[in-house]
Amino acid sequence: DLHYPLRRQRQMCIRDSNVTVRFKDVPFLYLPWMNFSFGGQRKTGFLAPILGNTARSGAEVSVPFYWNIAPNYDATITPRYMSKRGLMLGNEFRYMEQTLGGQLMFDILPDDLITDETRYGVAFNHNQWLGNGWGGSLHYERVSDSNYFRDLANSVAFTSRTNLPQQATASYFGALGRDGSLNFNILVQKFQTLQDPLATIISPFKRLPQLTLNATKRNVYGLDFDLASNWTHFSHPTLQDGFRLALYPSVSIPLQNSWGFIKPRIGVHHTRYDLNAPTGTEAKTANRTLPILSLDSGLMFERDVNLWQGKYVQTLEPRMFYVYIPFEQQNNLPNFDSAEMDFSFAQIFSERRFSGEDRINDANEITLAVTSRLIESATGNERIRAAVGQKIRLTERRLTLISPQTTAAGADFIAELSGRITPHILTDAGVQLDQNNFLTEKIRAGISYHPQPGKVLNIGYRFSRDVFEQVDISTQWPLTKKWQALASTNYSLKDDKLLAGLLGVEYNACCWSLRLVANRFTTATQKTSTTFFVQLELNDLMSIGINPIRALQQGIPGYTRTNIQ
């Protein structure tokens, strides 16, 4: 009976020996000695055991041991036995000082019963403030093999990982006189690439190192000056690599008041390459210099309206953006880090179509757009936002990542609608059209009904031409006063298969709850994994079993723990 101790003061400590924990008068846990606090203070000792079952590892049990080393240091050591794979040891160490902090995790399976190999995973994060504007960080991850997460992790957040970063940074941020700032960053970076045998990928370039310098200076005789620059040594075992210097100085004239703005801008993007020679050839040097001109402008109109028995402010925000960049053939340049950016409402007001520095798109384009928002007068909260935009190509696009493809003059159209239609219904929708070819490029549509905590229904649809077409449905719904249904599905209409699914029930009896959940997700091409979660949670005391909360929150947006008062 947990009611009596849980109603006592939160600082109450319990110390006892030969303790038997009973649930419904059934003894299920014997503790030769027990010492813990309801107030949440950290104490050294064993935590509640974790029980579970997965398709790839079999039945498993973990018994974490928590070591409260000092107020700013602690460690958790977790023996984890898996019936199909053997005994694994997990270790987590955390530390914090006034100017630094970090976390080290190291898991090892000395002799996997299936692969007959030692499996391990390590992750180290460290952040430090060095003073006078300087800071540094270290992030290192490595696993023993490409199947480590697919075989031993219980979450799609891990099994979907491909490139594990191994990097160190040092950065400086400071003022540049009055109304100015300066940011300098040093990055050394490489990755461990986890390969899927049925869909191998090329590993990213190493940056050994990358130096970045960005500076801004505002209101210099009415002008704003910006500088974006970086110098990078790219290294790769199989692809041509070398050095790249990128400079983009620009100057703009910001003219702005309460009802509108106009901002002309001119800049010059210069890139220099010093490339290493492939076998049997000479080293290569290349340069590219392109001017970039843009004009951004917009107006703001407002009016008071009465809707749904409430007072609102409705805005009308027309905006026009023009950009011009001349064409230059760039097939002779390497592509270290450029990729085409997703077409979105924010991106249509960008000068650049490609990320990175290796491809600078040609452009002679006008963007016309209008946004309207409905804002609650009393709170200032945005209730509904609607936006439409059209990017008009005055000349054909000649530069693409896939040469020699070109895009004719024409227009792209985008529309978005989002907001809280009623106090309990949220919606988010968008569509992108290629008006040249009368094709629908992308669609997203979603609606969420959330009338109260513990009661939510989400329905979503996503489409990208020639890439994917998917439906997402998820819910947390009460069946009775104490029982709740839990379900989610991510289904590919294009491939006619289930990509991820979750099904379970939750029972809440005020001071304890029980969760039974099955979670299936894709781990690799044509491979899936199923994890079964069984958790008994005794409120403020302990929980036994594999915790499914993270999987439920990922699979069911808006999921609420109903046993938290």
Language-model regions, residue ranges each:
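Outer-membrane beta-barrel proteins and related beta-barrel translocases across Gram-negative bacteria
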Residues: 8-11, 15, 19-565
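Short, exposed "boundary/linker" segments that immediately precede the start
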Residues: 1-2
